[in-house]
Swiss-Prot record:
Belongs to the D-alanine--D-alanine ligase family. PANTHER family: D-ALANINE--D-ALANINE LIGASE, D-ALANINE--D-ALANINE LIGASE B. Keywords: ATP-binding, Cell shape, Cell wall biogenesis/degradation, Cytoplasm, Ligase, Magnesium, Manganese, Metal-binding, Nucleotide-binding, Peptidoglycan synthesis. One of its GO terms (cellular component) is cytosol. Cell wall formation. This is D-alanine--D-alanine ligase. One of its GO terms (molecular function) is D-alanine-D-alanine ligase activity.
């Protein structure tokens, strides 16, 4: 069947902490598909129950929700129950990868490199001295299940650590305290199993937080950022990371270098941002893939 004859919904917005970013991504994706002649409707899931999609005659979904039910497997399961094909990862990969803790457990189990971490759960006693003894300072404190750097803190002093953990626990019941990696930061897109050129991120500020990601015009994105040899090295790690958690369609995997320039995996973004600041289209452009063609390719990969 020709997808252009189907009624397609771009799902965006929603109610997660990443709602605003998703609204921008959704608008861009909807406009791109319309420009290519698709029968497409943009739908903010804050305004409609998912089960109503079938009643509206929706035959296929481009899922560009960030965080929440759009990336944790709930939406994916509902769409499968209704028999509606959708873009991106399936139920299992979506559920696993929104949880940074369990993603890292899987990666570590197969020998993939990640930052060292201490896991803190809401309600448990927190031993600040023990954390510092293991990881030293500075450290990153982050909720296990939030994206877009929501609730992430860089902690430089012992006095800042407990307040940062307490604040992060407002967003999730599990918080990761991770060693601070001193090397360069990269984000590496994967499209239909092919690893695209890594994008180096030089943030406006101390780290790549929400402001640097979505609001600042001073954050620098360098692509291509690596020599062919280093790109091949990171691609091997990223492809293994993508496969072991069961990703499909498209995803973007964040990576950092440690002090010895070894790559360490950070996290997976199963519904990458598609705004004017977004990394995925910047990387795709170096391969001769326009924004519109990238959107169309992701849609074609929907199952």
């Amino acid at each position: 069947m020709n997808i252009k004859n189907e009624k397609i919904a771009v799902l965006y917005g929603g109610t997660s902490q990443e709602r605003e970013v998703s609204l921008h991504s959704g608008a861009a994706v909807t406009e791109a598909l319309k420009s290519l002649g698709y029968n497409v409707e943009g739908i903010d899931t804050k305004d409609i129950a998912i089960e109503k999609l079938k009643e509206k005659g929706i035959q296929r979904v481009f899922n560009i929700l960030h965080g929440g039910i759009g990336e944790n497997g709930v939406l994916q399961g509902a769409l499968e129950q209704m028999g509606i094909p959708y873009t991106g990862c399936g139920v299992m990969a979506s559920a696993i990868t929104l949880d940074k803790f369990r993603t890292k457990l899987l990666w570590n189990a197969v020998g993939l490199p990640t930052a060292d971490m201490v896991v803190v759960q809401r309600g448990q006693a927190i031993d600040i001295n023990q954390i510092i003894a293991k990881l030293s300072l500075p450290v990153f404190v982050k909720p296990s299940s939030e994206g877009s750097s929501v609730g992430v803190f860089k902690v430089k002093t012992k006095e800042e650590l407990l307040p940062a953990i307490t604040a992060a626990l407002e967003f999730d019941t599990i918080v990761l305290v991770e060693e601070f990696l001193t090397g360069a930061e990269y984000s590496v897109p994967v499209l239909d199993g092919e690893v695209l050129p890594a994008v180096q991120i030089i943030p406006d500020g101390e780290f790549y937080d929400y402001h640097a990601k979505y609001l600042s015009d001073k954050t620098q994105y360098i692509v291509p950022a690596l020599t062919n040899e280093r790109q091949a090295e990171v691609a091997k790690i990223v492809k293994a990371a993508y496969d072991v958690v069961g990703c499909r369609g498209w995803s973007r995997i964040d990576v950092m270098e440690d002090q010895n320039q070894n790559f360490r995996l950070v996290e997976v973004n199963t519904n990458p941002g598609m705004t004017s600041h977004s990394i995925f289209p910047k990387s795709a452009a170096t391969m001769g893939i326009s924004f519109e063609k990238l959107v169309e390719r992701v849609l074609e990969l929907s199952i």
